[in-house]
Amino acid sequence: MPTYFQRPENALKRANEFIEVGKKEPALDALYDVIKSKKHRTWQNKIHEPILFKYLELCVDLRRSHVAKEGLYQYKLICQQVNIASLEDVIRYFLKLAESRAVEAQEDSRKEASAELDEDVDIEDLDQIQTPESLLLSFVSGEDTQDRTDRVKLTPWVKFLWEAYRNVLELLRNNVRVEKLYHETAQQAFKFCLKYTRRTEFRKLCDNLRNHLNVTLKHQGQPNSVNLNNPDSIQMHLETRLAQLDSAISMELWQEAFKAVEDVYGLMQLSKRPPKPQVMANYYQKVALVFLKAGNFLYHACTQQRLYLLMREQKKSITSEELQKMASHVLLATLSVPIQVSLSNTEKYLELDEVAREKSKRLANLLNLQNTPTRESLLQDMLKANVLQYVNTKVHCLYQLLEKDFRPLDLCAKVNEVCQYLESCDDADLCQYIKPIQNIAVTRLLKQVSQVFQTIEFSRLMALVPFMTEFQLERMIVDIAKEKNLQVRLDHRTKSISFGLDLHVAHREEVPEGPYLQAMPSEGLRNQLTLMSVALQRSIFTIQHDHIKAKKREEQEQMAQNYLRTARKEHKLMLERKTVIEARKEYLESVMQERERREYEKIKKQKVENQEAEQKRLDEERRQREIQRRRQELQDIEKRQAMDKIAALKKTTVGAKALKDLSPEEIDNMNADDIIAKQVEQLDKEKRELQTKLKTQEKKVDYFARAMRMEEIPLLNKQYEEHLVADREFWENQEEERVRKAIEEHEKLVETSARLQRMIPDKDAFINTLRESRTEEYQAKFQAFQAKLEQVRKERLEVRRKRRIKDRKERKKIEMEEAKKREQEEKERKKEEKERIEREEREAKEREYAERIAKQNEIDRKRREKELEIERRLEERAGVGQVQQIRCLFITGWGDHEDGGDRWRDERGGDRGPDRGGDKPGAWRPKWQREEPDRGGDRWRGGDRRDGMITMS
């Protein structure tokens, strides 16, 4: 695209011109160049908004979602500090365009599908509406006509709309100025997924929103970021997550619904204010539905109870019918909770399923529960809340039947009557509890029957359960036995059911639960010592009644005395406890006040930071305005220069033609580049006019030739018909001539064949004679060839034998040379190895010699130091003169280097060690190793020398 459309209004005009001629791609490129240009970052309402609207229309027409995203991002940089409402209008317009195009595509798809169906109906017989071709196509592709048209027409626009929602959400995330639009777009995206049943896109949308929330939490406190401490922000997030939860439930995506529940709970925990009762009621309703669909009746019942308590406390104008309906829901949900395996206290402590415990704790946190609920705790809470008095009378008896009465013979019959009543009710939500309550009734029946009968026929048990088939009842019994909830055994041979185990077998302790009559026989045998202890205690109490009574009286008197003795102290402790409680309350109040003060200071600090940021923004805008003013001055200077060029251009022929159609306003808006462009445009215009004239002339010639062809068409048709008649006559004549000639030729050939039959004997005799003569000649030549072949073979064999002999000699010679070379290399290697060993030995000896020299030098150095020390001491004791005498004695007696280096070298005789010549007379050795009697011998190395020196002093 040309780069000289620098002014935005010119680019918009140019884009409209491209659109008028059907070139949308160049129009989009022209607008994109203006949007991304850094020269036009100062926002102007009358210029930038029309450009963005036109730009987005082109993006929607061409389905360029990534180009639209880039344009919106650039426009956000332009107007977010000046007028954020303009960005909101542009985004809403973009989404509206995309949605309208998707709706139009859906309508077109439906019309096309119905038209194809109408065509199929009109074809062939009405008795066979489905043709074999249509059946094969539907079975092979798995699609009907509507699906195929949707894939072609609707799917591209649905994909574009999804990308539009995703890009807009990514653009608006974590920006407090467009927070409301962000949540509106998210809710529109949920409606889009629900309308077009886009399950995969819904999951991606939920993940994106979750990531956006994490980014918001990570970048708290930054300028223009969303503040989750603001109640309005939390409320908008809650509304969005509740809309997400509604959409997930409508699409039956229960995993996403549970994740949405966790998100809602997390937002509630972030909020410093408690949520509104309406929000909590909606939350509990959705959570109860999610738990019900997941089959978790325990937490479903718990959620129903929380909803019931919330509605009864918060809703002031609740009617008796609503209260009765809610209470019935709570009762049925609580009774539908499966009966858990009763555990003893020891078994409860031995349970180590950390995964299940963590899961239960996680679910309990969603309902703000401190402890994990159980069926017994839910029943107790229901009784404490006095739910039974509001329950429907037909449903009220269920609690008595399943939890209180011991009536195994008509329990299921009574429960079946209540279930039939629930099926006949107008409230369809009550019917979802029928199956769980029937299962609970069968469990209660089996437990009660096990306490009365040891063995019962299966047919009789079937008669007690009217709402289950034989297979369902058997499956129920097996499940109960598998969960170790009952000691039961099925005997298919006798078609009976046995309760209890052998008397000597008891796998676990039996804990009474529900209506209870008596224990199992094995349980009695297992607890026989406990029962004996109870009986003995009763006997002792009966025999020693007076003694035990007197002992209890003494204990009571002792307790009374202890109380009187410590009553004042206990009273004082209670008063002190009251004081401690009051102090604790005051401390908590002070902590709350301090927290509020800190929060107020934090908000105040945030306001100050916002004001500073706003001041920085204003300063930046002021600086930008100054830059714009200077840029405008430069543009004015350039404008004056351009006007001078225009005045000069008008004096030329090309310039006059180029500027004659322009208004003064357009001339005022031109710069130097525009002037050059106008000159080039005028030249191009003249060239185009010439080409247009040539094209017009060409069209005239084309029209004339076309008219001539149109006129000659009838004549050509007539000529063609005449040619057909003439060609047919010609073909018939030629065909008759061909047949006649063929007959004549056949007759001639027959006559020739009869004439040539007489020549056959002569032909055979000639061929035989020729064959005999040629055979003899062939045999002679063949024998000559064999002889020559044998001779050539012998010559070649001789040549090959000689070549092999020569090759063997050369190979042997080469091997001998290589062996000789290897021997020479081996000798050189051994010689080098020997030299290396000698060199290493010589270096080792030199190192040893150097070490000995170093040791000798060290010894000499120490000796000289010792002599100097002795001289110093002697000077201190006897004076300088005596020291000189002693020094002379030392020099004369010990033969130091008075005579120079030659004397020292002459005295270097003696043993130099084993490596220096051994005991040879001329071998060198250190002076301290020599034995010289006249110099003192060993006394030099001992204490005599020191003693002699002291004597001399």
From Swiss-Prot:
A GO biological process held by the record: translation reinitiation
Keyword Coiled coil: yes
Keywords attached to this entry: Coiled coil, Cytoplasm, Initiation factor, Protein biosynthesis, RNA-binding
Protein name: Eukaryotic translation initiation factor 3 subunit A
Region spans: Disordered: 603-623, 810-861, 893-953
Localization, UniProt: Cytoplasm
Subunit structure: Component of the eukaryotic translation initiation factor 3 (eIF-3) complex.
Protein family membership: Belongs to the eIF-3 subunit A family.
Signal peptide: none
Biological role stated in the UniProt entry: RNA-binding component of the eukaryotic translation initiation factor 3 (eIF-3) complex, which is involved in protein synthesis of a specialized repertoire of mRNAs and, together with other initiation factors, stimulates binding of mRNA and methionyl-tRNAi to the 40S ribosome. The eIF-3 complex specifically targets and initiates translation of a subset of mRNAs involved in cell proliferation.
Highest taxon above the source species: Eukaryota
Residue ranges of domain PCI in the record: 323-504
Xref: Pfam families: eIF3a_PCI_TPR-like, PCI
PANTHER family, per database record: EUKARYOTIC TRANSLATION INITIATION FACTOR 3 SUBUNIT A, EUKARYOTIC TRANSLATION INITIATION FACTOR 3, THETA SUBUNIT
GO cellular component, one term: eukaryotic translation initiation factor 3 complex, eIF3e
Source species of the chain: Nematostella vectensis (Starlet sea anemone)
Coiled coil: 593-642, 670-704, 732-877
Record's compositionally biased regions (Basic and acidic residues): 812-861, 895-919, 928-953
